[in-house]
């Protein structure tokens, strides 16, 4: 090579490469936009709180996957790090690892392999469940964004989640919170203004470090709830009912047996109980009909019809819920001059249900809780003053024989007597937490507690709570 001539030829190579790419592009025709990842497409998305909550509906999920060939994905909002361990010493972070493994094995046994675990904290058991505790400790908006993302990723026709209501049963507040968030996500996943970074196109999908996710908005068609209530009279005819005694055509055993087998993988939570039932042939606890509660359907169909009744194959348009409207709030007189109502989760649900078009839920059952014999527990109350003047409320508590009031239980008060005065400012409210002590019963039974109030001598209404006291 002659002296002084450069040996650097990279620019020419680049020019040739660019020209070659241009020729290839012309040969291939116009660029196309890739469709959503079909590997994630689901017919059903289940949103539950803890690894093992899915076992409540394992019989139906087996039916859907094994015999109806539906695609099911599952999201757990927690990893169950506050749960018990009936087979070992592992707890906290370690029990979460084990419970995740158990859930994957359990769901895998019925053909469900697409499972995600969020990292919301598993809320320890309180005296009385309050969904607001879970929503607060979870960082509500963060978990909501995650569930919206999974709806947009999986594009389900149907969302199945836990009942957002307070019922007698296990009724963990995390269970309720998963239902609240799944309901909100059902209503928001089709709205591009919510979590817009999820639906914005990436700057360069063929390169690294994109911050926008490139998802599509998605409107699910139907929303169903399941419950861990200990009494199921209130769910009859509120949704489809499936027999767990039916025989699976693919497995040649009952769905009850399949459900027991699925549950048996959750050894830390159930020890050997499902295995014992399977070995002894006593499947009675798994053979009860499984009844879902229809939250809402955007495609019609009857309340008790099959979960997929009315579902269409093509995407449906976004259907916003009505949102919060004070005139539609189930406030039991809050728009009156004075009122008294149950607070906490009960007050929240009175606004939540109508805001999300859950028009059947207020009629499910009257306010209730379950407590143990002799248990000391709190009940939240709220006094409302909707006038332009401060008023003094007088509160009265009516309890059956054997009940007692904790004399230091009223928040913002020195002592709570059967009758107590509370000054409530103009256009304000006064929250109370009253602790009651249940009697000791030999047999379980329902009891009724009634609170009534006067405001400057005028009736301000009353509110009632049904309490199921478990006998010794």
What are these language model-derived features?
Residues 8, 28-47, 130-136, 140-361:
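Metal-dependent de-N-acetylase/amidase catalytic core
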Residues 28-154, 176, 183-187:
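Active-site rim/loop-helix segments in enzyme catalytic domains that contact anionic ligands
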Residues 382-387:
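Asparagine-centered strand-capping/turn motif at beta-strand->loop junctions
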Residues 403-440:
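Intrinsically disordered, low-complexity Pro/Gly/Ser/Thr-rich segments with frequent PxxP/GP/PP motifs
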Residues 439-471:
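Terminal connector regions
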Residues 373-380, 430-431, 443-449:
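Short, solvent-exposed loop/turn segments enriched in Ser/Thr/Gly
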Residues 11-24:
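Bacterial N-terminal signal peptides
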Residues 388-404, 408-411:
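Short acidic, flexible loop segments centered on an aromatic residue
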């Amino acid at each position: 090579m002659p002296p002084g001539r450069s040996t650097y030829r990279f620019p020419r190579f680049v020019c040739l490469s660019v020209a070659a790419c241009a020729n290839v592009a012309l040969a291939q025709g116009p660029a196309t936009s890739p469709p959503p990842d079909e590997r994630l497409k689901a017919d059903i998305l289940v949103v539950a709180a803890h690894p093992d909550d899915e076992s409540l509906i394992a019989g139906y999920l087996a039916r859907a996957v094994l015999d109806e060939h539906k695609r099911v994905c599952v999201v757990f909002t927690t990893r169950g790090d506050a749960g018990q361990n009936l087979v070992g010493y592992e707890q906290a972070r370690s029990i979460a690892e084990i419970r995740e493994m158990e859930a994957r094995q359990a769901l895998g046994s019925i053909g469900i392999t697409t499972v995600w675990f969020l990292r919301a904290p598993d809320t320890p058991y309180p005296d009385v469940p309050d969904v607001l505790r879970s929503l607060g400790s979870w960082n509500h908006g963060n978990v909501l964004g995650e569930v919206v993302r999974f709806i947009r990723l999986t594009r389900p026709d149907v969302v199945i989640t836990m009942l957002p209501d307070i019922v007698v049963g296990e009724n963990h507040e995390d269970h309720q919170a998963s239902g609240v968030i799944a309901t909100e996500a059902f209503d928001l996943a089709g709205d591009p203004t919510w979590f817009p970074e999820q639906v914005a196109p990436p700057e360069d999908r063929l390169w690294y470090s994109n911050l926008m996710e490139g998802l599509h908005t998605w409107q699910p068609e139907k929303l169903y709830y399941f419950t861990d209530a200990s009494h199921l009279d209130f769910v009859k005819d509120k949704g489809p009912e499936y027999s767990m005694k039916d025989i699976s055509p693919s497995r040649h055993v009952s769905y009850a047996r399949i459900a027991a087998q699925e549950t048996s993988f959750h050894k830390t939570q159930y020890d050997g109980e499902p295995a014992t039932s399977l070995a002894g042939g006593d499947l009675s606890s798994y053979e009860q009909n499984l009844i879902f509660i229809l939250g809402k359907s955007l495609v019609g169909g009857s309340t008790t019809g099959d979960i997929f009744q009315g579902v269409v194959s093509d995407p449906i348009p976004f259907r916003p819920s009505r949102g919060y409207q004070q005139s539609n709030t189930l406030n039991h007189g809050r728009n009156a001059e004075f009122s008294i109502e149950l607070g906490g989760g009960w007050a929240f649900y009175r606004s939540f249900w109508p805001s999300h078009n859950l028009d059947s839920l207020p009629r499910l059952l009257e306010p209730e809780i379950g407590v143990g014999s002799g248990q000391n527990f709190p009940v939240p109350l709220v006094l409302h003053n909707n006038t332009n003047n401060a008023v003094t409320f007088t509160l009265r508590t009516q309890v059956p024989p054997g009940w007692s009031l904790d004399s230091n239980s009223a928040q913002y008060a020195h002592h709570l007597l059967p009758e107590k005065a509370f000054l409530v400012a103009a256009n304000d409210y006064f929250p109370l937490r009253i602790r009651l002590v249940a009697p000791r019963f030999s047999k379980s039974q329902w009891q009724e507690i009634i609170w009534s109030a006067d405001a400057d001598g005028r009736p301000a209404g009353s509110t009632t709570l049904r309490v199921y006291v478990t006998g010794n």
